[in-house]
Design a protein with these regions (language model features):
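Transmembrane-helix signature of polytopic, membrane-embedded enzymes
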Residues: 119-142
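Transmembrane-helix motifs of polytopic, lipid-linked glycan transferases
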Residues: 106-127, 164
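Membrane-interface alpha helices of multi-pass inner-membrane proteins
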Residues: 180-199, 203-208, 318-323
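Membrane-interface transmembrane helices that cradle and orient dolichyl/undecaprenyl
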Residues: 127, 165-182, 300-302, 349
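Hydrophobic/aromatic-rich transmembrane helices and adjacent perimembrane loops
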Residues: 326-373
Length: 445
């Protein structure tokens, strides 16, 4: 039987279901199992897995080393340069206190699974289709591996809080939930900001959306009360975390390096600007997100929920611009923009899927279900995702080859340093990765 699809929110329609019904989503057990399976497979590819250590890039090794040094009394931001959130490094440090970084696989799995569940819900709200939702969720996981192979990036741990909050905003606009629930919203905001300060863009755009919604509905006082609830929720977390940061005397360093630095210095390396720009544009095109953004721009005036779609598009554009001008060859810079771009793309994929079903429902199809969604996604984006996959594999092979080639030298240097320097000594190493630091477990000078 052909799945009965309703038209997506990006296109105006009269006989729409009640919005409260659109948010009353009951996931099938098969969909939950699929997301669980995707999360497990993605987690097994994390660099916290000892078998994949050689695949770690400079940022991943630096993050693990920063967490390790917290167990040695060396504090991020003041003693070690760091741009991730305080709770992010604390979590890594706790894993080392428990004996191994392998404990981080549990954190990575939870992040993947919760992100997958709420990404599915968001797509289902747009598509009102089980097949489109699970198909786009599969693409979401594939792109997470392609762009952020090895995981362990702060944005991947903060993403569950962002997607839960986005779902919260949708339910607020649709179901008119109680204002006190914004305390929970504030808690989510605080956790995400202390894991990855880059999420500040999402929260600022959310504030604009809520303000615009309340002004449009002439509920300014109610909006102010909601704001107070958000602040109260944030204080519950910020006060606790801030207490430890204050005792460590790193609040000013944290604001400077974790908050101001990422938004004032887009260039992360001194690589060729034109070459890095070309690579990041390939990422933008290959992710399929530009396909969704272009469709949104073309049908913007027809959109049923312009404010909500504008909100998602705005966040995507800001994060995409930051990635394009990162002046770096690594692909992980596009991770913050990925879910928002795919949400825009899912709108167009839903329409194309409905056309295919309507045209071919009387014939037996070679593709069905998730494979049909992936097939539509790849073909309608002119096979550019395959180019992105090839680029990702090529960069991974190149970086791994370099790491393996230099691994013996790094091990020899690490062995020499551990025999010549006491445990409290400090070293300075000029290298692209922090492997020597991690292997010696010595503090950085």
């Amino acid at each position: 039987m052909v799945e009965n699809l309703e038209k997506p929110i990006g296109v105006s329609y009269k006989n729409s279901p009640s919005m409260s019904k659109r948010t009353a989503i009951r996931m099938k057990k098969s969909s939950r199992f699929s997301i669980l399976l995707y999360s497990v497979l993605s987690t097994l590819l994390a660099i916290a897995n000892p078998l994949l250590t050689y695949f770690a890039n400079g940022l991943q090794t630096q993050n693990l080393y920063t967490g390790l040094m917290m167990t040695k009394g060396q504090i991020p931001y003041s003693d070690v340069f760091a741009t991730g959130g305080f709770l992010y490094y604390v979590t890594i440090a706790l894993s080392y206190l428990l004996g191994s970084s392998i404990w981080l696989l549990i954190v990575q799995f939870i992040a993947y699974y919760v992100s997958g569940i709420y990404f599915y819900k968001l797509v289902y709200y747009v598509a009102q289709s089980e097949i489109v939702s699970i198909g786009m969720t599969l693409i979401f996981y594939i792109m997470n591996i392609v762009l952020g192979f090895g995981g362990m990036y702060p944005i991947q741990w903060a993403l569950p809080f962002m997607l839960i909050s986005l779902w919260f905003l949708i339910k607020f606009c649709v179901d008119n939930i109680v204002d006190e629930a914004f305390i929970f919203y504030g808690i989510l905001a605080a956790f995400s900001l202390f894991i990855d300060p880059q999420t500040l863009i999402f929260w600022l755009c959310s504030f604009v959306l809520l303000t615009a919604t309340n002004i449009k509905q002439k509920q300014s006082l109610r909006g102010f009360y909601q704001f107070l609830c958000v602040v109260f929720g944030m204080i519950l977390i910020a006060y606790t975390v801030g207490y430890f940061m204050f005792n460590l005397q790193i609040i000013s360093s944290y604001i400077d390096k974790a908050i101001f630095y990422p938004f004032t210095y887009f260039a992360r390396t001194n690589h060729s600007f034109l070459l890095s720009l070309a690579i990041q544009i390939v990422v933008l095109l290959g992710s399929g997100c530009l396909f969704g953004l272009w469709d949104f721009i073309q049908n913007r005036k027809k959109a049923s929920y312009q404010i909500g779609l504008n909100f998602i598009a705005c966040i995507f554009i800001i994060y995409a611009i930051m990635a394009i001008f990162s002046r770096d060859f690594n692909l992980y810079h596009f991770l913050p923009a990925l879910p928002f771009g795919l949400l825009l793309t899912s709108n167009k994929i839903t329409i194309l899927y409905q056309k295919v079903i309507d045209r071919r429902s009387h014939r037996r199809q070679y593709f069905s279900g998730k494979s049909l969604i992936v097939d539509l996604f790849v073909k309608k984006t002119y096979y550019l995702p395959l180019l992105l996959v090839s680029l990702s594999i090529g960069l991974l092979v190149y970086n791994t080859y370099q790491n393996v080639t230099l691994s013996k030298e790094r091990r020899d240097i690490s062995h020499y340093l551990t025999t010549k320097i006491d445990r409290d000594g400090k070293i300075y190493v000029w290298d692209k990765v922090a492997s020597i630091y991690s292997q010696t477990r010595l503090k950085s000078a």
